[in-house]
């Protein structure tokens, strides 16, 4: 018989820097999960990733206090900022533009994010990422 799932915990944790302090400690502690076991496993799995890169993680908590977790790709916003070397998006995205991104850069980001997106094909994924870029005040070139 399969284990009984008691809940899911969604967090964004910097790669290789999971520790028991908030937000990880309280979120896992409420479910009675072993916080240090998660931190060690997460840090071990994210060794090859750029340190400090925020990674979404979905933790599945079971009734017997065990857990499993799935690490997703970094948020599109983070990848866009990294691609065009930007610190933060525009406070007024539709009037003040903060940078430009090309279709080639968008395709690279879309390929990296493809498994986490619901897009049917690469072109749809590029349009999705382009929408995220526009909403943070980045001018998108080559995408209608």
Swiss-Prot record:
Alphabetically ordered keywords of this record: Methylation, Ribonucleoprotein, Ribosomal protein, RNA-binding, rRNA-binding
GO cellular component, as recorded: cytosolic large ribosomal subunit
Modification comment: One or more lysine residues are methylated.
PROSITE patterns: RIBOSOMAL_L11 (PS00359)
Intrachain disulfide bonds: none
CDD domains: Ribosomal_L11
UniProt record, GO biological process: translation
A Pfam family per the record: Ribosomal_L11_N
GO terms of molecular function: large ribosomal subunit rRNA binding; structural constituent of ribosome
Subunit details: Part of the ribosomal stalk of the 50S ribosomal subunit. Interacts with L10 and the large rRNA to form the base of the stalk. L10 forms an elongated spine to which L12 dimers bind in a sequential fashion forming a multimeric L10(L12)X complex.
Stated family: Belongs to the universal ribosomal protein uL11 family.
Protein purpose: Forms part of the ribosomal stalk which helps the ribosome interact with GTP-bound translation factors.
The name this protein goes by in its record: Large ribosomal subunit protein uL11
Species, as recorded: Polaromonas naphthalenivorans (strain CJ2)
Gene name of the encoded protein: rplK
């Amino acid at each position: 018989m399969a284990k009984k799932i008691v809940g899911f915990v969604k967090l964004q944790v910097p790669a290789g820097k999971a520790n028991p302090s908030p937000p990880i400690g309280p979120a896992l502690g409420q479910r009675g999960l072993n916080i240090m076991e998660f931190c060690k496993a997460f840090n071990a799995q994210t060794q090859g990733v750029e340190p400090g890169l925020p990674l979404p993680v979905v933790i599945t908590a079971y009734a017997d206090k065990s857990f499993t977790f799935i690490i997703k790709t970094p948020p599109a916003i983070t990848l866009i900022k990294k691609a065009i070397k930007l610190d933060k998006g525009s406070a007024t995205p539709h009037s003040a533009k903060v940078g430009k991104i090309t279709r080639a850069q968008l395709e690279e980001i879309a390929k990296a994010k493809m498994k986490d997106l619901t897009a049917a094909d690469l072109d749809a994924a590029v349009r999705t990422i382009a929408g995220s870029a526009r909403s943070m005040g980045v001018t998108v070139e080559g995408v209608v």
